[in-house]
Design a protein with these regions (language model features):
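Active-site neighborhoods and metal-handling regions in enzymes and metal-associated proteins
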Residues: 1-168
Length: 168
């Protein structure tokens, strides 16, 4: 559902189009955001539902991030993907960002947390990306969102400025 190459298919009105834009920015630092748009600007009810789940996922997880919070505690409290979306999840909920995608890499935990290393904690001035892909197994569409932040002593400073779609 994600990480697909382009084809010769013409994008039509009502199609979802997602961009994951890893870019080298000023002084060689990486900028990384993901957005999903609908061609023609009008979301279907199903697209709106998926987009709402994706924004809820990002909002919930970013509110958990505080200086000193362990990656394990974050993973334990993180937003739980719906069962019908779990096997389509993106490889991580959070990754570091600097000159490229970097540590930490916080995966979606399995039930006993044996699938990844959750040692470490959020530190002041870490730059991270909080991301999600919401798409049902067997579904035709999905929503990919990602924002970039700096961890501060007072919470998060959002580094990405491109707004999320306003669903009406």
């Amino acid at each position: 559902p994600w990480l697909q190459e382009c084809s010769n298919r013409v994008i039509e009105s009502g199609d979802l189009v997602a961009f994951d834009t890893d870019m080298v920015g000023p002084y060689g630092y990486c900028a990384d955001i993901s957005r999903t748009f609908v061609e023609g600007g009008k979301f279907s009810d199903e697209q709106r539902r998926l987009y709402s789940l994706a924004t809820e996922h990002i909002q919930h997880n970013k509110e958990l991030i505080k200086t000193g919070t362990s990656f394990r505690e974050f993973a334990e409290k993180s937003w739980v993907l719906p069962d019908n979306c779990y096997h389509n999840h993106y490889p991580c909920m959070i990754h570091g960002i600097g000159l490229c995608d970097e540590w930490p890499f916080i995966a979606y935990p399995n039930k006993d947390f044996s699938n990844a290393d959750f040692s470490g904690h959020f530190e002041e001035n870490m730059t991270i990306c909080v991301e999600t892909y919401i798409g049902e197994v067997g579904g035709k569409e999905g929503v990919k969102l990602e924002d970039q932040y700096r961890v501060t002593s007072n919470g998060l400073e959002q580094l990405s400025s491109f707004p999320l779609e306003q669903l009406t």
